[in-house]
Structure formats: structure tokens, C-alpha cells
From Swiss-Prot:
It catalyses: uridine(38/39/40) in tRNA = pseudouridine(38/39/40) in tRNA. InterPro entries: PsdUridine_synth_cat_dom_sf (IPR020103), PsdUridine_synth_TruA (IPR001406), PsdUridine_synth_TruA_a/b_dom (IPR020097), PsdUridine_synth_TruA_C (IPR020095), TruA/RsuA/RluB/E/F_N (IPR020094). Its EC number is 5.4.99.12. Signal peptide: none annotated. HAMAP family: TruA (MF_00171). The active site is at D53. It comes from Alcanivorax borkumensis (strain ATCC 700651 / DSM 11573 / NCIMB 13689 / SK2). This is tRNA pseudouridine synthase A.
Length: 267
């Protein structure tokens, strides 16, 4: 039996999230397992690094599965992609040791939230970005973001339906990058709570719109009451772009994406 890790990219627009649900509900996991099972000629179950909600995209999702099928890595990629719908792609495949676990071996995660800040809505990328039609004060948003970096209780920034045992997370960095009319919020943490990035984005956008001062982000954090924060930002602009693992697993290093952004962003 061989354990295999895959890098997965998907457009979450037409999915009800990552996780397998009842029959007839379209999820990324369901599509991926069906495709891999055809290649393996046996039933395949995948374990992902992090589940994403309906409408959320992934460029750096990582999964693992076990198989005794005698397939080369390129066969998993080519065969899998042949059997996958057009909105899911296998980016890479590598054999890993039995102690590798897509979720529990991860040391950090990185998300990007992409905002199109323009008076007119986009026609081509309407499901890949969040449109904000009024100017945003990026300097104020950066100041607000600075209050959230570090080890904190993020109760006020998680969904009321979040089932995580602890609201304590370490936000390593929270950066804002301007690419013309596109604003990219990049969050890097040991792990994230349900809706955490989207709730952070909602607060920062409210600050950027001048409706709240930057220190309000800190006030929301310290109140530990979700009801006192901003509305949860839409899922369309959110991307899971990277899962970081110890170097000993030697997983491929790919551009974070989405692919229409430069490989390297500068503040």
C-alpha cells in the first residue's frame, strides 16, 4: 500500500464546499474521489488539509490517500484530470511516507482574499473576486490588520457554528497587496477557524470604507462577541493558497495563485 499526496486546484463556484455530503450534493471531495477511484480501479477516500465552504476556491489544497494500484505518479495526475470536471485539477502527485497526514502534518495555512475595488462590477471574474464599488483606504486597513497579528482568542472572528474546540489561533501575518484595482488580503496562520478569514475581511473592508476606525478591529477581537463584528464577507474572493509542511516531506513548491496574480506580490 502506497500513500500518495496530491496538490489540488478548484473553482468553488459551483460546489457546496469541499466535504462529502448526502447523495446528489456536488462537492469537491466527491468529484475527486470518484475520479481517483476510476484510476485506481478501487474505492479511494481522500483526506484533505483543510475543508473549504461553498463558493470558496483552492489553489493550494493538499490531500492524501492510500492505494495498492501499480500506478506511476503521472498516471494519477493525467488519469485523475481526465476523469475530473473542468473546475477541479490535480496539480502534482508525489509518494509520501506512511506518517504523512494532509491535515495533521501541516504546520501552517495561507489564504488570500481578493477584492476588486472599482466603480463597475467585473463581468469575467465575478465569481473569483469580491467586488467593492467604493474606494478603500488601504493604509487604514493595514493599521487595522496589525492589531490582529499574533496569538489571540478569535471568538469574535469565527462563525457561531464553528465547532473548533479552541478559539485560540496564531496569526503569523496579515498583509494587504495592491495590484491595480485588485486588493489582495493574505492571511498566514497555524490554523484558521470557520469563516475566520471572511470575517476579518469584513472588518477590514468596513474600516477601509471609513465606517469604523482602524482600532475597531482590536475592539472586536477583545470583545469576543461575534455579533459586534462586521458582516461575513462573501465566499467568492477567498482562496486556500498554501499548506505548509515540514521540509522532510519534500512536497512540491508551487506559485500560490490564483494564476492571474503575479507569482510575487509586493505591498
Amino acid at each position: 500500500m502506497t500513500r500518495i499526496a496530491l496538490g489540488i486546484e478548484y473553482d468553488g463556484t459551483d460546489f457546496r464546499g469541499w466535504q462529502m455530503q448526502q447523495s446528489g450534493v456536488r462537492t469537491v471531495q466527491e468529484c475527486l474521489e470518484a475520479a481517483l477511484s476510476k484510476v485506481a480501479n478501487h474505492s479511494v477516500t481522500v483526506v484533505c488539509a483543510g475543508r473549504t465552504d461553498a463558493g470558496v476556491h483552492g489553489t493550494g489544497q493538499v490531500v492524501h490517500f492510500d492505494s495498492d494500484a501499480p500506478r506511476e505518479m503521472k498516471s494519477w495526475i493525467m488519469g485523475g484530470n481526465t476523469n475530473l470536471p473542468r473546475d477541479v485539477t490535480i496539480r502534482w502527485a508525489v509518494p509520501v511516507s506512511d506518517d504523512f497526514h494532509a491535515r495533521f502534518s501541516a504546520v501552517s495555512r495561507r489564504y488570500r482574499y481578493v477584492i476588486y475595488n472599482h466603480a463597475r462590477p467585473p463581468a469575467l471574474y465575478r465569481s473569483q473576486v469580491t467586488w467593492n464599488h467604493r474606494p478603500l483606504d488601504v493604509a487604514a486597513m493595514r493599521e487595522a490588520a496589525s492589531y490582529l497579528v499574533g496569538h489571540h482568542d478569535f471568538t469574535a472572528y469565527r462563525s457561531v457554528h464553528c465547532q473548533a474546540k479552541s478559539p485560540l489561533k496564531t496569526l503569523h501575518s496579515l498583509e494587504l497587496y495592491e495590484q491595480g484595482k485588485v486588493l489582495v488580503l493574505e492571511a498566514h496562520a497555524n490554523a484558521f477557524l470557520m469563516h475566520m478569514v471572511r470575517n476579518i475581511a469584513g472588518v477590514l473592508m468596513k474600516v477601509g470604507a471609513g465606517k469604523k476606525p482602524p482600532v475597531w478591529a482590536k475592539d472586536v477581537l477583545e470583545c469576543r462577541d461575534r455579533r459586534l463584528g462586521a458582516a461575513t464577507a462573501p465566499p467568492f474572493g477567498l482562496y486556500l493558497v498554501e499548506i505548509e509542511y515540514p521540509e522532510l516531506f519534500a512536497l512540491p513548491d508551487e506559485p500560490l495563485g490564483p494564476l492571474w496574480l503575479p507569482d510575487r506580490l509586493e505591498a
